[in-house]
Amino acid sequence: MLDLDRTIDLFTDIHGHSRKYNVFMYGCAFPEISIDSRNNSIIKVLPSILNDRVEAFKMKDCKFALEKEKESTARIVLFKELQIVNSYTMEASFFGTEPEEVAKNNTNNNNEEHEDDDEDSNGG
């Protein structure tokens, strides 16, 4: 039975990714014009901690947005319907971390390919 006196502080949907290296997260963000936009820095706390403590996790590959085409994802539904600010999709590459020489070449394009890859894998 649902206990209405409790809150959900964190939701993470975990996926494998077949087109990118590393471990990274997609999170939601309030529109800049919203009074709630001050929470956008809070949304990045967990990914920042993971970036500092987990070698395979790369903050540069993370993306924080509410995209129309992703409205049906668990992360966005829970963010909007249950107001779970810390609602994420964590992606982990099937291929491991980015090889050092590839990382050096990608520094300028900041892994632009991931913009279309959100929840690409396993029915995401």
Give residue spans per PLM region.
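Structured catalytic-domain cores with a bias toward divalent-metal coordination
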Residues: 1-124
